[in-house]
Every structure is written in structure tokens, then in C-alpha cells.
Amino acid sequence: MEQIKYLLIGIIFSSAISSSLQCAYENCADWANPGQSQKHTMCLYPTTALGNKCNEGRIIQLTEADKQYILQLHNELRAKVASGGESQGSNGPQPAGKIGPLKWDNEIAEIAQRWVNQCTFEHDKCRNTKANSVGQNLYMMGSSEKSENTHDILTASVNSWYSEVKDFDNRSVREYKFEFTTGHYSQVVWGDTTHVGCGLVQYKDSGFYTTMVACNYSPAGNLIGGTVYPTL
């Protein structure tokens, strides 16, 4: 049967932790309410249980091969931009620069998984580690049938984020200006970001099998006024 698919794209954590234990993560500043803080995702959701919005939900466990594939997808695109091989952009080709390969981070992957386990397609408010701030890209795909091929899901998500390059102004590489339409791309190629970790969940929503992907990035990119990556 032919599958019906839809895509929804957003902007710019798996061992159980007993809720009786004090959460080891620090809260994050609430920028909308100075002096207040947001509770960390791992403290809000102290177990790996799926949230009540996860109708017929299941966690998609990433194998070591899946993790390496996520790195491959990201690092091939980062290398392409670094070499000056990206001709797309709203103001011309992207400049070559220094963009190193990403490594996998189990901690931020666990935080990403804990968040997608809630089956809520929006960004969590507090996901930083003790070492770094953490950025995030989200992707959601729906189908009339269950999606079983994890590599296809991962390919679609990373390629969707990167495709925003066509709208990215190359002048923002040296002095970053956040745009909702290109925030995924800039996080994928952000030069100071060194690690990535992702989580996936599948659940049923409005008759569709919905797969949600969250990839967390450390240190976070998309710093307004910062350098996306050093140009050559």
C-alpha cells in the first residue's frame, strides 16, 4: 500500500533514574522571566517511561551502526561546506572554513531521548549539561504505515535540516544573525560544536504513525553575533 507521508520541521535524554533521587542536573535560566529558572528535562521526566501523549508509542533504540550513520551524515555535510563545495545560499555560495567532525555524546543523546519520550513536537526548555550549553534540532515524519527503516528516517531528518542552506546568507557566517528558516542548517555546520547525540520515538497521532527525531548538539550553536565557523 502506498504510504502517505507528511513532514513537520522545528527551529532553534536511557537508564531509569528514580524520582526519589535529587536530580544531578542544574536548572537553566528562564530568559522570559529574569531571576527565574527552567527545570531540566532529566529532572522533569526522571524515568524512561513514555509520556501520556505517546499513543501506541515505542522507543526506537539506536544501534552503534545507527550512531555512526548519524555522525557520517553530519560530518559529510560539514566537510562539504568546509571545503567550499556548497554552492547554494541566498547571497551566493557558502565560504570555505574550518569545521571539524562531530563525535557522539551519550549524555546529550540520553537527554534527547528523554525529551522525545514525551511525544511533544516542540523544544524542551532546559537540556544543558554541566560542561556545556546544548542546542537542538527537531524533525517529525508521519506515515500511514509504521516506519521501520531507521536509516531512512535519519537521512530524511539531517537532509531536511541541511536543505535550509539554500536560504542562508553567507554574510552571516562571520557574524551570525538568527533566522527561523535557516536555524537547523547553521546548527549542523556550527564550527564550535563538537558533539551530537540523538533520540527517536514513534507513536500514533491522528491516524498516522509519527516518528520524532531530536538531535542535541554540544556546545550549542546559533549564538547571535558569533561566528558560524572561521572562514579561510
Swiss-Prot record:
- Residue intervals of the SCP domain: 71-217
What's a single GO CC term here? extracellular region
- Tell me the disulfide pairings in this chain: C28-C43, C54-C119, C198-C215
Q: Which residues form the signal peptide?
A: 1-23
Record-linked SMART domains: SCP
Entry keyword Disulfide bond = yes
Subcellular location per UniProt equals: Secreted
One Pfam family it belongs to: CAP
Q: Name the family the entry cites.
A: Belongs to the CRISP family. Venom allergen 5-like subfamily.
Q: Which UniProt keywords apply?
A: Allergen, Disulfide bond, Secreted, Signal
Task: Please name the source species.
Answer: Microctonus hyperodae (Parasitoid wasp)
Q: What is this protein called?
A: Venom allergen 5
Q: Where in the body, by tissue, does this protein show up?
A: Expressed by the venom gland.
